[in-house]
Amino acid sequence: MQCDLTGAQILRPGGLVPDVVSLSDGVFVETPQNRRIDLSGYWVLPGIIDLHGDGFERHLAPRRGAVRNLGAGLVATEAELAANGITTAVLAQFYSWEGGMRSPEFALAFLSAWSNMAGQFDTDLSVQLRFETHMLDHYTQFYDLVRRFQVRYVVFNDHVPHQALAVGKKPPRLT
């Protein structure tokens, strides 16, 4: 699509100013285009980048244990992000001993759904995979998952409740 966005307030380094923005094939260009779109009364702002999102989980499972179609959940996630001006998002997915949506099995299912949806998103959705460091028996499996799905952002976590363990408590998932 080639067009000029006219009549809007454009956010520039000095603030909002009335200006014209020209686009060609999704890229800002200097050369005016033939088609004009009047955006009088609107603002043109840059997209927001969310580098660590975990609010998307409610779209994958509307309530605890109610995991449905992960692809549909990703579509709903993207729609909410876009509606809020987020054009680039990193979805933070656990790979943990904590189970449920944080389990290695769920991480695989999530990454599979995300990979199957590749190319269908209008926003830039990537994944941050959060690995629990105490899962020593899983390092090779985790590495293979990262390579298989080309995950570019990995975080190493330690969610072991050290203080509780120090006073003799043992959380159910650690028994």
Region roles according to the model:
Residues 96-100, 105-175:
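Metal-coordinating catalytic core of metallo-dependent amide/deamination hydrolases
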